[in-house]
Every structure is written in C-alpha cells, then in structure tokens.
Regions:
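Helix-boundary and loop/linker segments of multi-pass membrane transporters
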Residues: 2-7, 44, 244-248
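Flexible loop linkers connecting adjacent transmembrane helices
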Residues: 30-40, 75-76, 122, 152-161, ...
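Transmembrane alpha-helical segments of multi-pass membrane transport proteins and ion-pumping complexes
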Residues: 13, 17, 21-26, 30, ...
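Hydrophobic transmembrane alpha-helices that form the pore/transport pathway of multi-pass ion
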Residues: 33-101, 107-114, 120
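Helix-coil boundary and interhelical linker segments in multi-pass alpha-helical membrane proteins
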Residues: 116-132
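Core transmembrane alpha-helical segments of multi-pass membrane transporters/permeases
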Residues: 1-30, 264, 269-276
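Long, contiguous bundles of hydrophobic transmembrane helices that form the permeation core
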Residues: 128-287
Length: 287
C-alpha cells in the first residue's frame, strides 16, 4: 500500500518520534540539560560545552535537530552570549551540535531506517557503525568550542557548592565512571544469567526485576528536589553534580530497554522502540 519512504515512516519513524516526544514531555530533555550543566558548567567556555554535550545526549533520546534546538538552544544560546561567545558563534555552535544529534545512536534520523529497507542492513549494524563517527564529531566540536573559549578569554561560571581541589574532582569523576561501568556490567550479566538459568520463564522474571529497579530509582529520585524547568540565564549558577544526576536516573530505563532489545535480544527496531514506549508510559503513570 505504502511506498518505501512512507512505509518506513509508518513502521519505524513514528514509534521512535513517539518515544522521543514522551521522554521530552516527561522531563528527560530538561534532565539531560541540567546534568550537562552541572557536570560541565565549571569548565572554561562551559555554556558552549554544555550545548555540545546536551545536544549529544538529547540526540540519544530524540534524534531530531529541531527538537534539539528548541529544548536546549533557548537556554544555551543566551548563556553562550552572556559568557562572551557572541550571537553568531553561539548560534553556529548550537546548530552544529543539534544537527549531529541525528547520527547519534540508538535513536537516529530517518536515513537510518531508509537504509534498513533499501540496503537490508540490520539496525544493530547501523548503530555499531554510526557510534564511532558520531562520537568523533562531538569530540571535535567539544575541542573547537574549547579553542574558541581560549581565544576569547572566557572564564568558568560560578558553582553552587564550595570549590573542589583537582584531586577531589578527579576522584569524583573516577568514582562516577567506575560506578557507571559496574552497574552496566551487573545489569548485563544479571540479564544473561537469568536467561541462561530460567529459560522460558526468563521474561517474566526480568520484568519483575525491571519493575523493582524502576521503583528503586524512583525512590532515589524522590529524595531529591525537582529540577528547575529552565536555567537562570541572567544569573547562571552551576548546581551540584551528584544530586542533579540522581534526581532523574529513572529516565535512563526506557533508553536502556531500547538498547537491550536492539543489541542483546536482537529484536527489530520497531519492536524495540515499542517496548521502550511501554516503559516510558509506565513511568509517566507512576511519576
């Protein structure tokens, strides 16, 4: 009934756009922005680096250039202008960062789904081959905005908490990265172990474990105050990193489900996005 392009839109693009819209409406876009601001706002040229990193993580969620600019640009562009980048540079940085969000796995632009239909490449292979170029493009943008900050003499912004020594910063980053890797490894091996031991009963067991994980992360987030809906452009103050990260960890569950279904269970792109949408709807009901 449909042509190839329209069939791809109905079969794949719609469900991924729905997932990105639900995540954004639920607050995941603002969470990504606040976390980027908390982690990078203290660096030289922090607003521009926040724009680059927040566009990358928003690209993971939505893969939409327009949505990226709308959700992040209204805050990062004024912040960059206030820091001293100027209107032209600020707009160029936000545009380049947002456009690259379309090639950031696992949710990608329409061209990735057209490749599935025209070439017959599995979506997991597209993700694997797109990850390195997307990462390199954002590393290059991060480096470019740092050079611009050095040329313009832009200084770091103020922090909400007491200043930390370089050793404290290194220890904090080390613990954060190590903890993230440990948690990812535990989740992977627990899932593989349950499938190996339980066999056909693995799916309901994994659903129960996922429900317990969701409730636990919601409980952690409930102990912290809600994130502000925007950044104070007039007088920006960087929030504390760890409380900001913990306040929205449950947003990572739908993204984790999407990646698991695509990479581990080898499900189709549409079915993987469907299960991620179901998880997102559950979170919206229980929030």
């Amino acid at each position: 009934v449909y042509g190839v392009a329209l069939g791809v839109s109905v079969s794949y693009i719609f469900i991924f756009v729905l997932l990105g819209s639900l995540l954004d409406r639920c607050g995941a876009g603002n969470y990504m922005m606040q976390v980027s601001f908390a982690l990078l706002g203290h660096l030289r040229g922090g607003p521009a680096k926040v724009a680059v990193v927040s566009s990358a993580v928003n690209g993971i969620v939505s893969a939409s250039s327009v949505a990226n600019v709308v959700t992040g640009g209204i805050f990062t562009i004024p912040l960059m202008k206030k820091a001293g980048y100027g209107g032209v540079r600020a707009g160029a940085i936000e545009t380049a960062s947002s456009v690259n969000g379309q090639i950031m796995p696992p949710v990608m632009g329409a061209a990735a789904f057209l490749m599935i239909e025209y070439v017959g490449i599995p979506y997991t292979d597209i993700i694997k081959h797109a990850l390195l170029p997307a990462s390199i493009s954002y590393v290059a943008l991060f480096y470019i905005v740092h050079l611009e900050a050095l040329k313009l003499g832009i200084m770091p912004m103020m922090s909400a908490g007491a200043p930390k020594t370089p050793l404290q910063k290194l220890a904090g980053w080390g613990m954060g990265i190590a903890g993230t890797l440990v948690v990812m490894g535990l989740v992977y091996w627990i899932g593989i172990g349950v499938r190996a031991v339980a066999g056909g009963a693995a799916t309901p067991i994994l659903l129960v474990l996922l429900l317990v994980l969701s409730v636990w992360l919601l409980r952690i987030s409930a102990r912290h105050p809600d994130l502000p809906t925007d950044i104070n452009v007039t007088n920006p103050v960087r929030p504390e990193s760890w409380p900001t990260v913990r306040s929205g960890l449950y947003y990572l569950i739908p993204i984790g489900i999407l990646v698991w279904c695509l990479a581990v269970d080898q499900l189709s792109a549409g079915l993987s996005a469907f299960w991620a949408v179901m998880a997102m709807l559950f979170q919206m009901v229980t929030q």
